[in-house]
Regions:
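N-terminal leader/linker segments that initiate helical-solenoid repeat arrays
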Residues: 17, 21-86, 93
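Terminal, low-structured helical/coil segments at or just beyond the last alpha-helical repeat
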Residues: 2-3, 31-39, 45, 221, ...
Length: 281
């Protein structure tokens, strides 16, 4: 199991396109989905039936660290983070060089808010296995959220150089390119992420924003609509769809989409501002 298997979705809190776009101002500082993580919690993985089956495997081989790593991943996918942490601890105690378990435990530490412990575990994982792409991607996400952008970029770049098939590496590097106004590079990375994870909404939303930044409104609209089709609970995508309607002068449709974005995420300020603009008059 790698770190991807226990990634959860976090709230979409990126910089959506704002009113500045409506007046034709540059988009260089805008970006989308800074979490860079687009895998849902799967409660079924943490179900009593599934855990019971995995526990039976452990009972048959209590000294096998892999059993604890697998069950820990199931707990993590089910959102049971303390139970996951305990299993990864046991896996590492049984095999101090279990680099996958370090990377998985790091992800759980991130979800529990202990970023220092997470960083230490990611560092240990890549120290044991310098070719483990999932640890570089996880550490890169940690760095990016901490504002350590160059270090984040280096980790995503390393994972890509290792020929990772994990879409997060390309998605996250694309987010960095996007935040720097390098939209052609961002579009290329988002496109690769889409080819690797065609059912993930976030790369479509990200690519749509970069298309919009390059004034390719038709492709932007198509991508953002696809993001909504894949994930109807993506508040940022609804807000971005509304922005395009607003740019086109269709205030009624814009207000409807902004309203849906606010319903999904009442704290998402770009949607709240957009709804205020389009609901007046």
């Amino acid at each position: 199991m790698n770190a991807t298997s226990v990634e959860r979705r976090t709230a979409m809190r990126g910089f959506a396109l704002t009113a500045a776009l409506l007046s034709g101002l540059a988009l260089a500082g805008c970006q989308t989905a800074p979490t860079g993580e687009f895998t849902n919690i799967d409660k079924a993985q943490g179900s009593a039936e599934n855990i019971s089956s995995l526990s039976a495997v452990i009972q048959r081989s209590p000294q096998d660290p892999e059993g604890y790593n697998v069950r820990g991943s199931a707990y993590g996918r089910g959102g049971q983070y303390q139970a996951a942490l305990k299993d990864f601890d046991t896996a590492i105690q049984l095999n101090p060089n279990f680099y996958q378990a370090y990377s998985n435990r790091a992800l759980i530490q991130r979800f529990l808010g202990d970023q220092a412990a997470a960083l230490a575990d990611y560092n240990r994982s890549v120290q044991i296995n310098p070719d483990y792409d999932a640890a570089y991607i996880g550490r890169g996400n940690l760095y990016r959220k901490a504002g350590r952008i160059q270090e984040a970029f280096n980790d995503f770049q390393k994972a890509i150089q290792l020929d990772t098939t994990d879409a997060r590496a390309y998605h996250n590097r694309g987010l960095i390119y996007q935040s720097q106004g390098q939209h052609a590079f961002a579009i290329e990375d988002f496109s690769t992420a889409i080819s690797l994870a065609p059912d993930a909404a976030e790369p479509y939303n990200g690519r749509g924003l970069s298309y919009l930044a390059m004034n390719d409104e038709d492709n932007a609209f198509a991508d953002i609509n696809m993001a909504i089709k894949l994930d109807g609970k993506n508040a940022e995508a609804w807000s971005n769809q509304a922005l395009i309607y607003e740019r086109r002068g269709d205030k009624a449709k814009a207000a409807k989409s902004y309203r849906e974005a606010v319903r999904l995420n009442p704290t998402y300020q770009p949607a709240k501002d957009g709804l205020a603009r389009t609901s007046t008059g």
